[in-house]
Amino acid sequence: MAKYNEKELADTSKFLSFVLRHKPEAIGIVLDREGWADIDKLILCAQKAGKRLTRALLDTVVATSDKKRFSYSSDGRCIRAVQGHSTSQVAISFAEKTPPQFLYHGTASRFLDEIKKQGLIAGERHYVHLSADEATARKVGARHGSSVILTVKAQEMAKRGLPFWQAENGVWLTSTVAVEFLEW
């Protein structure tokens, strides 16, 4: 595997998140309904847009991402963001899964008042993202300021017929979390 510095890997990961989750049209690619993009076309379009992108750099980002944000298709010809999409082009068909008793959501403390009023909503994304452990939730929340960890009564939600899914990188997904299912 080729050597790349941390900044180059982080910048490439952010670029891939942008085009594979939110704005594929920004560089002229099209994602299929499951979020897959042809790798050769992605590289070509990225280069035309002035981004340095190679298969070796993609391989390194996919292999070394601690959050496993991206995956390759079984034939190695396509790449996708595992979850976190806001583009209407994508509707990944995750299999419904029974969650553990509790899941966790990390957020910045400045969002707490709004969450206490409306619960957790997906916003521009397709799903609310939840973690199986508090440490991961804390890292997620810290990205936006002083973090607060919310406990989600996931099994109670599931018993009431509210569905959960789990992305291949372990992130739990649900459509919304009402205030009654949250512990502060």
Curated annotation (Swiss-Prot):
Q: What class of enzyme is it?
A: transferase
The entry lists its GO molecular-function terms as:
NAD+ poly-ADP-ribosyltransferase activity; tRNA 2'-phosphotransferase activity
Q: Which SUPFAM superfamilies match?
A: ADP-ribosylation
- Write the record's keywords in alphabetical order, separated by commas: NAD, Transferase
GO biological process per UniProt: tRNA splicing, via endonucleolytic cleavage and ligation
Q: Which InterPro entries match?
A: Ptrans_KptA/Tpt1, RNA_2'-PTrans_C, RNA_2'-PTrans_KptA, RNA_2'-PTrans_N
| One Pfam family from the record | PTS_2-RNA
Report which superkingdom the organism of origin falls in.
Bacteria
The UniProt record lists the EC number as 2.7.1.-
The record's annotation in NCBIfam families points to:
PRK00819.1-1 (NF002012), PRK00819.1-4 (NF002014)
Function, as annotated, reads: Removes the 2'-phosphate from RNA via an intermediate in which the phosphate is ADP-ribosylated by NAD followed by a presumed transesterification to release the RNA and generate ADP-ribose 1''-2''-cyclic phosphate (APPR>P). May function as an ADP-ribosylase.
Similarity annotation: Belongs to the KptA/TPT1 family.
PANTHER family annotated for this entry? PUTATIVE PHOSPHOTRANSFERASE, TRNA 2'-PHOSPHOTRANSFERASE 1
* Identification of the protein by name: Probable RNA 2'-phosphotransferase
Where does this protein come from, organism-wise?
Escherichia coli (strain K12 / MC4100 / BW2952)
State which gene encodes it. kptA
